[in-house]
Amino acid sequence: MGNKIHPTGLRLGITQEHRSRWYATSKMYPILLQEDDRIRRFIHKKYGAAGISDVLIARKADQLEVELKTARPGVLVGRQGSGIEELRTGIQKTIGDHSRQVRINVVEVERVDADAFLLAEYIAQQLEKRVAFRRTIRMAVQRAQRAGVLGLKIQVGGRLNGAEIARNEWTREGRVPLHTLRAEIDYATKVASTTYGVLGIKVWIFKGEVLGDEAQSMPVGASPRRRGNRRPQQFEDRSNEG
């Protein structure tokens, strides 16, 4: 079962949290759900260069709170916070309510190469540049290992290297216990558009096990190049506060 079901959905409430946190009536639920989908599509389409790995949405009364986890917070924030205001206006336009209070928090991803979505995005970019898929996978594995992950699995499917018959190729390094519910598995998918068609990319990253109320921390390992062990940046939007 662990190989069939979505790793995040299987672990909701155990090691994973919901990407949207709000309550609604049966009448409003589909409306708000579609709003969340439009917001996420808008953010990933317009700010794809910012390396956004996750978008968390929370609703409190008439306030909409959006938390963005990104590898390049400077691209989102802009000069003197001008990017935040532009993003807020774009979200209000997307949901069709310019009077809605939108609060935006930008959090920097501490380990870029240990994030499944960002690693899948890197693989997609390399494949779209016509880099051989085996070389791309090998480079992605090396980057993740330098970031200190406990294990990872990468699968690429489609017309690999322009072959006539589509197939799947995968590799695994370390442990990826998909059947263990307490295992913290970071899972992401991405599509690469090539001249031969689309390639599907799946990435599983094992970050440790949650034992009771305490999580087994990821080994420190080697730090990413040129980034050091500096503290991750966090930009909290306080413009709506009195």
Swiss-Prot record:
Keywords: Ribonucleoprotein, Ribosomal protein, RNA-binding, rRNA-binding. One of its GO terms (cellular component) is cytosolic small ribosomal subunit. SUPFAM superfamilies: Prokaryotic type KH domain (KH-domain type II), Ribosomal protein S3 C-terminal domain. Residues 233-242 have a biased composition (Basic and acidic residues). GO terms for biological process: translation. Residues 39-110 form the KH type-2 domain. Part of the 30S ribosomal subunit. Forms a tight complex with proteins S10 and S14. Binds the lower part of the 30S subunit head. Binds mRNA in the 70S ribosome, positioning it for translation. This is Small ribosomal subunit protein uS3. It comes from Prochlorococcus marinus (strain MIT 9303).
